[in-house]
């Protein structure tokens, strides 16, 4: 069984083949986007992690203070992220490329961040290959994958709301995978000033919603 537990705005713990990977798993509140709640943060401090991976250096995805506190009480996990993540964790050996633990391989895919203002932001998405193939997008922009047939089609796609907020984006999402989809990076419905929830629900109502899940904070999803 492979599980994903949401612990942050756009990330969480992926547990596959006995390996635990924290993916963008601790966040600070930014605008309507959610911070990691204190109870989940305490749980993370008590959890053995084999890898900690960050897609990019934005505070709703990356909290270097968590790493510094975590390693005071645990052996140093493998740390993976782009160059500006490595710069903010310069006391540790951050891997700025692909890596593996046991039978699980994490493949760093250079990706373009959503939004024209973030064109120069170093950003990875992560392919996680073990007994299933999962793709964790972080904040990777959907249009960059259009027509990119050389990428494998994952069994599970973990992606931000933008992959289902318009019909054009959903068409790309369906080209990426016919497997399960976990949508992240959505605020609480009660604090959704950008009206992201209505946009996503409008698209999903027109398509095969049964394979899409939008986990709440702390939800454990059996993904494979």
Q: Model-derived features: where do they sit?
A:
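Active-site neighborhood of phospho(di)ester-bond hydrolases with catalytic His/Asp-centered motifs
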Residues: 23-26, 48-60, 79-83, 135-140, ...
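Active-site HxH/HxHxD metal-binding segment of metal-dependent hydrolases
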Residues: 40-99
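Active-site-proximal loop/helix segments of hydrolase catalytic cores
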Residues: 113-175
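Conserved beta-strand hairpin/beta-sheet module of binuclear metal-dependent hydrolase folds
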Residues: 1-41, 119-139
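Binuclear metal-ion centers of metallo-dependent hydrolases, dominated by the metallo-beta-lactamase
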Residues: 5, 90-102, 120, 148, ...
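Active-site environment of divalent metal-dependent phosphoester hydrolases
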Residues: 7-10, 29-30, 58-64, 86-89, ...
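Pre-active-site segment of Zn-dependent metallo-hydrolases
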Residues: 17-53, 64-69, 116, 141-152
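Conserved catalytic scaffold of divalent metal-dependent phosphoesterases
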Residues: 19-30, 94-99, 103-114, 139-142, ...
